Regions:
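N-terminal chloroplast transit peptides
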Residues: 1-13
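Structural and coupling elements of P-loop NTPases
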Residues: 11, 21-414
Length: 414
């Protein structure tokens, strides 16, 4: 579903542009019609590899942290504010990131949630570090774009959207900071449609904004999710589910707000197109979620809905064919190299997106650029700054090769 070659942009002469804007993979291996074993195919289908992108200060890293909280990867969410007593975030672990409260380098975070294995890449929002974000967008199958509800589409948002569009990366939108004074939600989705050129498909709808923001209405389930705030949003928000006509909902909202919400929900059914997963994956429609990452409102709703719709690993275009992720030939490409991830050891990590097949520790691969055979002895799975030796990985996964590997960004390994 959604893996047609029509979603792939044409390759350009520049290898750097190819890395940013296409699914180009210069494989020269012999064609293989063999596929991975059934158990490995199931593992590949479980993968959801995506990036979170935004204009600076839209709440991207906060949303990342809350997805980890609801995904069970952490028990207590950190904060990106400068208060010393608050816990630091899992994704912003570098000294500069902790000091400035911003992301300056992309971070890989893998965790399991229900039936999915999630590979989440938190990216820098500030334009000074945007090159790192562009490289990451060559390694993902979808992207979550975070919008500030008080500001709407901002310059860096539009710039990153264009990169995703050229690469055929499906976009999911999270309109954040509904707990603050916000622009009218109908105005926001109208702007998104006009500026981005994609059909909006609101998955949920906000119940008020600012201090009056109480939760969201799940349009698919026809349920209202009412939340209670927790200190600093460090824990999961207590949730109460009810029908929109339930007396609990009427009591939680003012008469005026309740009437506004019911009218807007009815209007949406008449003016927006039904959510169509095929159109989402084809880059024609964008699911839209409302919430507050800081207070955990709407985060779980977004996470579960997103994982249902987001694509599993998609193929990449080689010089002669589409590379199927389920082929038994291992292939991958280098999309990022970062030095001094561990200052005590002055190491160098080479980030590889696995495109097809299975990675096994100590396997030998060929660097297609140099023709050299290389043994991958020290591969690691990363969770922010934490590392774990990796014995096996599958198409869709991101691995870090640590050591003196003589690879360059854009290298293909087979």
């Amino acid at each position: 579903m959604g893996q047609s070659t029509g979603r792939v942009a044409n390759c350009t002469a520049s290898s750097y542009q190819s890395l940013l804007f296409t699914r180009f993979l210069p494989l020269t291996t012999s064609a293989s019609t063999n596929t991975v074993p059934a158990a490995a195919a199931r593992e590949i289908r479980r993968r959801r590899t995506f990036a979170i992108i935004s204009h600076p200060d839209a709440g991207k890293t906060t949303l990342t942290e809350k997805l980890l909280l609801y995904g069970g990867a952490i028990g207590l969410a950190g904060s990106v504010t400068s208060k010393k007593e608050q816990q630091s975030t899992s994704s912003d672990w570098m000294g500069m990131e902790k000091e400035r409260g911003i992301s300056v380098s992309s971070t890989v975070l893998q965790f399991d949630y229900k039936d999915c294995c999630v590979n989440l890449l938190d990216t820098p929002g500030h334009h000074d570090f945007s090159e790192d974000t562009y490289r990451v967008l060559s390694a993902v199958d979808s992207a979550v774009m975070v919008i500030d509800a008080g500001k709407g589409v901002e310059p860096q948002t539009l710039k990153l959207f264009e990169v995703c569009r050229r690469r055929g990366v499906p976009i999911f939108v999270f309109i954040n900071k509904m707990d603050r004074p916000s622009r009218p939600p109908l105005e926001l989705i109208d702007e998104l449609e006009k500026v981005l050129g994609l059909a909006p498909a609101p998955v949920n709808w906000p119940l008020g904004d600012g201090p009056r923001f109480r939760g969201v209405y799940d349009r698919k389930k026809g349920e209202v999710n009412l939340y209670e705030r927790t200190p600093h949003g460090a824990f999961k928000a207590p949730l109460e589910v009810a029908g929109i006509e339930d007396e609990k909902v009427r009591e939680a909202l003012s008469d005026e707000l309740y009437e506004t919400v019911t009218q807007e929900v009815e209007l949406l059914d008449g003016v927006t197109e039904p959510l169509d997963i095929e159109r989402v994956l084809a880059g024609e429609q964008m699911p839209i979620y409302f919430g507050s990452a800081m207070n955990n409102f709407g985060v779980q709703n977004m996470l579960e809905s997103f994982l249902e719709m987001a694509p599993s690993p998609t193929g990449r275009v080689s010089e002669s064919k589409m590379v199927d992720p389920n082929t038994d030939n291992f292939s991958g490409f280098v999309f990022k190299i970062q030095a001094n991830m561990n200052p005590r050891h002055r190491d160098r990590a080479v980030f590889v997106r696995i495109v097809s097949g299975i990675f096994e520790r100590d396997m030998q691969v060929v660097d297609q650029r140099s023709g050299r055979k290389v043994r991958l002895a020290n591969a690691q799975k990363l969770f922010g700054q934490d590392r774990e030796t990796l014995d096996t990985a599958y198409a869709g996964d991101i691995l870090a090769l640590v050591g003196n590997y003589n690879f360059l960004i854009g290298d293909t390994l087979t």
